[in-house]
Amino acid sequence: DLRANDLKRSQEIVESKSQRLDAGILDLEKRKFLVDQKEEYLIKLLEDVSGLTKYQAKELLIKQIKNKSEKELISILKNAELQAHSKAKIISNNILILAMERIKVELTSQRTTNIVKLPSDDLKGRIIGKDGRNMKTFEQIGGVDIVVDETPNVVVVSSFNPIRREIATRTLEQLIIDGRIQPVKIENELKKQEQELEYIIQETGLNTIKELNINDIDIELVKLIGKLKFRTSYGQNVLAHSIEVAKLSGAIASELGLDVEKAIRAGLLHDIGKAIDFEKQGSHVVLGAEIARKYNEDPIIINSIESHHEDKEKSSEIAAIVAIADSISASRPGARYNAIDEFILRMHEIEKIGNSIPGVAKTYALQSGRQIRLIVDPLVASDLDLALILEKMKEQIKNKVIIPGEITITVIREKKETDILK
């Protein structure tokens, strides 16, 4: 009986709890219903106020969040880009500083005169010669001016063409040592010194490629490199500039982990066209690319030559490095002087005009272009042609070249007969 009473009591407790649970569930359902109604009412109210449905409001909210996120992302990216640019600038500056510290820069400016020292002022009369014949021989055969003034124990060899000036200077120095100064001796010595200078040009080229550790290069290209020693541009010696660009290019390439040997070679050859641009028509860029192709240089070298003045698009990192190195070398203080180069361009133009006239073998622009000598080929032009050649030269000079003051043009036709009596 006691067990039956306990069981009955337990059943009553369970039923009581079950009833309370059912009542609670019912109450929750009523509350949920009221909340749902309230939610629908509020949504309807918001839709009426905003003019948006629930789904439209949801889309608008998502869009606003997306726009905000995009703005934040753009801001982050801009900051990262600025930091990257700043870091890249610091790195690039460090590379250039390291590259420039690793090379020795020499300031080499242009001259249009050489000074020849004399052991005695008495030699000046012998240099001038009877009726100025010796000086005229230097002008007509050598294409230079010999300036004799009151300055003690010196004479000046003047010419815008550095190769002619060097040949004439060496000739005069040798004649002073020899003691015999006369037209025939001057002419022979000029020819001899021209041959010797060709050897010096080749040796200069060989020493240059040795200094830069450049191999497998055609000997004719080596000679052109040596010829740059006697070429100037904007007052800057072209060989010195090319060596500087080569060293800078190699140093920058080394810092960037690129082909150092190719960068040095491209830097050295970037202005190779200037070895012949006073002899052939065309820009030094076009002529340089032609030279590089002729001697089977690498396409990267050719493109570096073609693109260093932005004439063509750069196809490699090496080409970009050469252009940068060229700008550094050309822009440093004291590297270039425009006025002298403009003068030289005028002198070249005068000689090109003269040489373009039929019958003219050689043209020399002397005394800053105020004296022009036209040497006529006696086998092509007769004495009767001299006046016509003179008129053609005068007309073209008037139209193409501006030279202040008076210009004296002299046309020379000379025929020599030489024989050996045995």
UniProtKB/Swiss-Prot annotation:
Name the UniProt record assigns to this protein: Ribonuclease Y
GO cellular component, one term: membrane
A GO molecular-function descriptor: endonuclease activity
Family annotation (InterPro entries): Diverse_Catalytic_Enzymes, HD/PDEase_dom, HD_domain, HDIG_dom, KH_dom, KH_dom_type_1, KH_dom_type_1_sf, Ribonuclease_Y
Highest taxon listed in the record's lineage: Bacteria
Alphabetically ordered keywords of this record: Endonuclease, Hydrolase, Nuclease, RNA-binding
The KH domain, residue ranges: 112-172
Protein family: Belongs to the RNase Y family.
Residue ranges annotated for the HD domain, each copy included: 238-331
Keyword Hydrolase listed: yes
Gene3D superfamilies for this protein: Hypothetical protein af1432, K Homology domain, type 1
Keyword set includes Nuclease: yes
One Gene Ontology biological process: mRNA catabolic process
EC number(s) on file: 3.1.-.-
Organism in which the protein naturally occurs: Mycoplasma mycoides
Function text: Endoribonuclease that initiates mRNA decay.
